[in-house]
Each structure stands twice: as structure tokens, then as C-alpha cells.
Amino acid sequence: MDAIKKKMQAMKLEKDNALDRALLCENQARDANLRAEKAEEEARTLQKKIQTIENDLDQTQGQETLVNGKLEGKEKALQNAESEVAALNRRIQLLGEDLDRSEERLASATAKLSEASAAADESERARKILENRSLADEERMDALENQLKEARFLAEEADKKYDEVARKLAMVEADLERAEERAEAGEAKIVELEEELRVVGNNLKSLEVSEEKANQREEEYKNQIKTLTTRLKEAEARAEFAERSVQKLQKEVDRLEDELVSEKEKYREIGDDLDTAFVELILKE
């Protein structure tokens, strides 16, 4: 009887110990589940942060590409404007050369006209002298008439030359007028081009400032990219660590659940043994 009681007490003690171990396993399993849920939540948070960082990185790279494209367009526009200015300067130089040649032709025609006018004046003076002078003899008169005819012929030739010179002078004046018009147009175009060049210069300064700002922004973007890349690597490392922690915790939970099942099985067996012992005790009494 004492042996049975001792056995029952031992079984009861073992049962209590099994209950304590079962409760301990349940608490450990609960804590492990909480740690696993917390680790999964941290992993999801890290994944969201990684996605946000990747989106920021894509947006930064897109802005950098847009700024570079605008800068290339401004540089092409500046090159085109410089080419137009060079072509117009060449045209202005050619117009100036045409004007110089026209002025030379005008000066030559004016000199020839002066010579013809002087010859005509001299012939007229000679004719008047011959008319006023008393002619002594017929031979002298014939000679004077011949001289007069020659002088008239020279005067007619001078008139013809004068007309030709006047015609050429009119042509030269017309050419000069057209050249002056072209020169005025060229000067107006020069003023316009100078204004455009000033605007282009201002735009170039703005572009230089924009380029400097773009370089600063590019450097900032590069620093941001480096920072984001570092943060991304750190987040990935933390995510991998969290994933490994979750896996480790999951294994611990599985182990504790297995122990809990084993302890429950032992508890059931002890309960069965106690029931059997009580039955045997009752039967013996």
C-alpha cells in the first residue's frame, strides 16, 4: 500500500513537473511566435523602405537625364546662332568691298568729267577770242574757221563724253544707292544680330549658371545615390538578417511545439497511469 502511495505521489509529482514543463513550453512558444511576428513586421517595413529608396533612385536618375537633354539642346542652339553671326559678318564684309569699288568708279568718272569740262571751256574761250579778233587775211580766217570747226568737234566730243560720263555717273549713283541701301540693311541686320548676340550671350550666361547648378545638382544626386545605395545595402542586409532570424525563430517554435506535443503525450500517459493506479487501488480495497 505504501509502495502504491509512493508511486502515486511520484507519478503526481511527475505529472506536476510535466504540467510545469508544458506551461513553460507554451510560454516559450508564445514568446517565439511574438518574436517571429515582430521580425516579420520589421522585414515588411524594411521591404517598404527598400521599395521607396528604389523609387527615389529611379526618379533622381530621370531628373538627371532630363537636365542633360535640356543642356545639350541649349548648346546646339548656341552653335547655330554663332554660325549665323559668322555668315552675316562675311556678307557685311562683301558689301563693304562692293561699296569701295563703287566709290572708286565714281571718283574716276568725276575726274573724267572735270577734264572734259575744262576742255570745253578752253574751246569756248578760244572760239570767243577768234570771233572778237580782227581777221587780217582769208587764210588766217580759214585757219581760224578750221580751228573753230575742230574746237566745235572737240566740244561735241566733249559733250558726248560728258553725256557718257553722266550716264555712267547715273549708273554709278544708282549702284551706290543700292549699295547704300544694302549697307543700311546690313547695318540694321548688324544691330539686330548684335541684339540677338547680346540675348544669346545672356542666354549663354544663364546656361553657364544653369550648367553650374546642374553640375551641383548632379553632384547632389550622386551623393544621394551613394547614400541611397548604402541605405539600400544596409536595408538588404537587415532584411536578410531579419529573414534568417525569422527562420531561426520558426525552427525554435517548431521545436517547442514538438516538445509541447511530447509533454502533452507524457502528461496523457501519466494520467492514464494514475487512472490505472486508482483502479488497482480501489480493486485491492
Swiss-Prot record:
It comes from Chironomus kiiensis. This is Tropomyosin. Tropomyosin, in association with the troponin complex, plays a central role in the calcium dependent regulation of muscle contraction. Homodimer. The keyword Transferase does not apply. It comes from the Eukaryota. InterPro entries: Tropomyosin (IPR000533). The molecule is in a coiled coil structure that is formed by 2 polypeptide chains. The sequence exhibits a prominent seven-residues periodicity. It holds the Pfam family Tropomyosin. Belongs to the tropomyosin family. Residues 1-273 form a coiled coil. GO terms for biological process: regulation of muscle contraction. The keyword Transmembrane helix does not apply. Keywords: Allergen, Coiled coil, Muscle protein, Repeat. GO terms for molecular function: protein homodimerization activity.
